[in-house]
Amino acid sequence: FIGGATTSALHTAVKIAPLYDGPVFHVKDAAQNPILAMQLAGNQREHAIACLRYGQEQLRQELQRKTNQQAQDVIKSEAKNLKASTLSISWEDETLVQPTYKGVRTFEDISINAVRPYINWKHFYNLWGVRVGTPEAEAIRREAEALLDAIQHKHHLSARVGFFEAYGTESSIVVNHEVGCPCCGGVQKQTVIPTPRQSRPNAEGYCLSLCDYVAPQGMNDHIGAFAITVSSSFVEALEALKRQGEPYDSLLMQSLGDRLVEAASEWLHEQVRKTIWGYAPDERLEIQDLYKAKYQGIRPAIGYPSLPDQKTMFLMDELIGLSSINIRLTENGAMYPQASVCGLYIANRKAEYFMI
């Protein structure tokens, strides 16, 4: 028998009875105990126990029903709030510029000299754990510049850039493939790129997703896809340093490779905005402005805050053919060479970088 001011029939049915093989009775008043004991000692025992267990099962089912309903109500409420906080763009007022080509092209032999001015040395210093302006930072900068001087005519970078008609849904970007599409020959009609949405509103009250920045179906909007990596000769030189047991020199070259790829990403994105896609032909920005993303559009990279799922790399491989520039993917979607980057180009003027 269970009784007391802090007990209840529901608590007994849900929390106590399932833990005990025998019957567990809840009594509101101790005066009921003798009456219940008489029933259990007499010929009404089986009937009393059967009624008890039936009633407790009904209580458990009713609680489960209410719990499920409350959960559904919460989900619906969150979905309603999320939909209310989704960014809404008046697409009729937007100018959707067509890229200069559709499909995929390779940009070979991007020179180190071309991208060198775009290196963000702050990130280089962060990698080495030195502060800007310190003697340590100045010393490693001199060594890095000397290495760049030595390799600038020996190695290069390569890129793949594709442009595709696309449209946004509530949770993805859908890429359309034309007949003769270089990635599939038009056999595969669409590629769906999932774009996760923020679960909490930002400062402006929106829960952002990259799909918000791509026009709905039927408006002839486009996105770009890109990948950039160092040349095979760069990778071979780096591996040779590792085999020779030169940890400092190999780390210096690896860190420069990472910075060169990011610099090439900045340089190529500028070319895309001004000429290759051409949606911002009159852009005039300084390098420091580029670091602060003051340009129109964005280039979210796979595996980074707004596209965190590394397996999206396999979709990118389908779109632009990473092997064409000697990028290989691991089973988890990581790229080799390590000094590589891959992502999307989105041109909308309201697009911004954000974290999921």
Where are these regions (language model features)?
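Short, ordered loop/turn segments at secondary-structure junctions
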Residues: F1-T7, K28-A31
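Glycine-rich, charge-decorated loop segments at or immediately adjacent to ligand/cofactor-binding or catalytic sites
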Residues: A5-Y20
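Structural recognition of alpha->loop->beta junctions
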Residues: I16-P34
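Active-site loops and adjacent core secondary-structure elements that bind or stabilize anionic groups
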Residues: A31-L251, S255, I276, N326-Q338, ...
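Activity-critical C-terminal alpha-helical subdomain
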Residues: L241-G245, E266, Y279-I356
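Charged, low-complexity helical/coil segments in non-catalytic cytosolic or luminal regions
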Residues: V261-T275
